[in-house]
Every structure is written in C-alpha cells, then in structure tokens.
C-alpha cells in the first residue's frame, strides 16, 4: 500500500475525495480527525476503502491468511519528519462501532 495519508477536521470528507480534493467515490486514505497528526496517539486510526482491483486497503485482507500474516510482519509508515517501522501483531476485521475505534485511554 503506497498512498499519502490525508487528514482533515471532518472524517467524512476524504471518504469520497482525492488527495487533490476532487470528488471520487473511492476517496482517499486518511487519518482520524481526532488524531494529533504525528502518529503519537495511543491508537492512530487510518481509514480507507477496500476497492475492486486491489487498490487502497484491499490488500490488507491478505492478513486474514495466517501464512501471509507470518511472512509480512513489518510495514513502514513514512512521514515528512519521521519514518516508522511498524510491527503487525494482530489483524481483525471490524465494524465502525467496535471498541477498536477507541483513541483515548485512561491511565492504568
């Protein structure tokens, strides 16, 4: 997956707009509006469509296959300031009302 990650104050905008802000049903990949933008939150949620033909997040479905999961344990998130090496430790299909969408956690 090699797309820019957009962000705006309205999570609905990039659901159907391109990086150049033109209307498009496929939209863009974007960071949750409540995130700080530097990927330093406890949980940074990135949204994107799974589209026909393998674009955007469609390839993430491959993580449902255990062999693929084991053979692709790392991905890189590149930002203008920092390049992150990320380790995949779990994969789950979920719905928009799932607990996985929690972005703020209390002190424990």
Regions found by a protein language model. Give the residues of each.
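Solvent-exposed, non-transmembrane regions of membrane-associated and secreted proteins
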Residues: 1-108
